[in-house]
Amino acid sequence: MPRLLLVRHAEAAVQASGGDRERPLTARGWADAARLGVYLRESGLIPDAALTSPARRAQDTLAAILQELPPSRPFIAKVESSLYCADADTLLGLLPGPGQPIETLLIVG
């Protein structure tokens, strides 16, 4: 059965010189995201594909998670600009359709 994993970015800095999209993760954020990667690995929730917001904090969260996961079969990672401030309808529109070879999709926003 296909699975959808929705993850909010880890703790980010309050401000960044490049504005909201450029806020990096804090040290705690990196550690928390890595722990989530360990949890996913130990739970057998290994994604086939991942979508992430263009926000730096979301991309960093995904990077920290992926560092803790085993290399997967062909893995698809994509920055999806519509994820920045996305609503439920936007998320639904990003889901793979029938017949697409994605068993577990991870979305980080």
Name the predicted role of every residue range.
Residues 4, 100-109:
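Generic beta-sheet signal
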Residues 43-46, 98-103:
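Glycine-rich phosphate-binding loop signature in dinucleotide/nucleotide-binding domains
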Residues 40-41, 94-96:
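Short, flexible, glycine/charge-rich loop motifs used to bind or transfer phosphoryl groups or to couple energy/partner
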Residues 68-69, 95-98:
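Short, hinge-like loop/turn segments at secondary-structure boundaries
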Residues 83-95:
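Short alpha-helix plus adjacent loop in nuclease-associated cores
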Residues 19-20, 30, 92-94, 108:
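Surface-exposed beta-strand edges and their flanking turn/coil or helix-capping segments
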Residues 2-81:
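Active-site-proximal alpha-helix that buttresses catalytic centers in soluble enzyme cores
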